[in-house]
Amino acid sequence: LTAGCYSQTDWKSFMSRQDMTWTRLPQTWYEAPFMGNGSMGSYICKEPGKNAIRVDVGNSMVHDHRTDDASIYGRGRLLIGYFLLHPVGEIKSGDLRLDLWNAETTGCIRTTRGAIKLRACVTSESPYILVETEATAGEKEFTWKFYPENTDSPRQLNAIRKGNKNHLKKDYVSNPAPQLSARNGLNLCWQILLAGG
């Protein structure tokens, strides 16, 4: 006995009707389009308080390796950092689309000097976040800059930020600060962890 099902659904067209769209730029991470491959992840939003677009870098495999710490502070996933796209002009508006069929985010940032189109994705089998841009003449000189995050436990950082002494681990030893360098024309960020990894 065999059973089968045949569908004439145009899946690309069907999926495009499910795409999420933003008619204004997301103002924070929880409004942003998220992309990922199960390990590597990213989101895109306007950086709060700055004239810049944030492309976050995250990876669930980046975590602390403190075996002498059985608490939730010793093995937590660590923040990596983010890129900021700094336009030439002042950001006035923008739009984004999370394309489900192609697993990518596309959009346009409009400024007082022109526009920057972008297309971003997280590759499915490799740990890469790809961002392609195309700028009008007035925005050709926009820049990218990487900003590393603090490599301490996010729980510890959150307790410090909120001034919550009940959740502050008193004997927590901070990881060294990230080191930025350049080699062979590539910009690098080295994040050393006390317990390795």
Model segments located where?
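Hydrophobic h-region of N-terminal signal peptides that target proteins for export
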Residues: 1-5
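Aromatic-residue-lined binding/catalytic grooves and analogous aromatic/hydrophobic interfacial grooves
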Residues: 6-197
